[in-house]
């Protein structure tokens, strides 16, 4: 048996336990690489777009273990059309039921930082998790949610080591 420095045996059960707790960084240490899920981008409720944070929503055909509800820093990985190359796009990833909007269905949505021009509908993408930013929360107001989302983007940029980006276009918020 191979044991980790903590004395625990490396196992897929350990990885699933870490993911269930939202510890994607711990899962990456056990796996030896970042945890990734795959799915097809589908149409959602377009709430993110109306708030100035367009998202790529994964359909229910997700491959891989979805981590605990929360907001994560990570990457959207897509095939570059017409090539054999992959494009890694920095992303703030939301996993959960969207309690702010009384959501019932658990979803995975990724907002690509600094990009509002992407049309990923129908594409099969990978979502790679680097670090958990925070648990899923409900806020008292739309402004509270928007302020937190801006902070989530800044934290995501910091974790990923890229330039700080705020909301795509604050004037585009149509949900007020």
Region annotations inferred by a language model:
Residues 8, 20, 34, 51, ...:
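Hydrophobic alpha-helical segments and helix-packing faces
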Residues 44-176:
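Phosphate/ribose-recognition catalytic cores of enzymes acting on nucleotide-derived substrates
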Residues 26-31, 37, 42:
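Charge-rich, low-complexity N-terminal segments
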Residues 34-35, 153:
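Residue-level detector of secondary-structure transition/capping positions
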Residues 9, 16, 36, 47-49, ...:
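Basic side chains
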Residues 7, 38, 125-129:
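General secondary-structure edge motif
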Residues 1-30:
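Contiguous mid-protein beta-loop-alpha structural module that forms a pocket-lining wall or clamp
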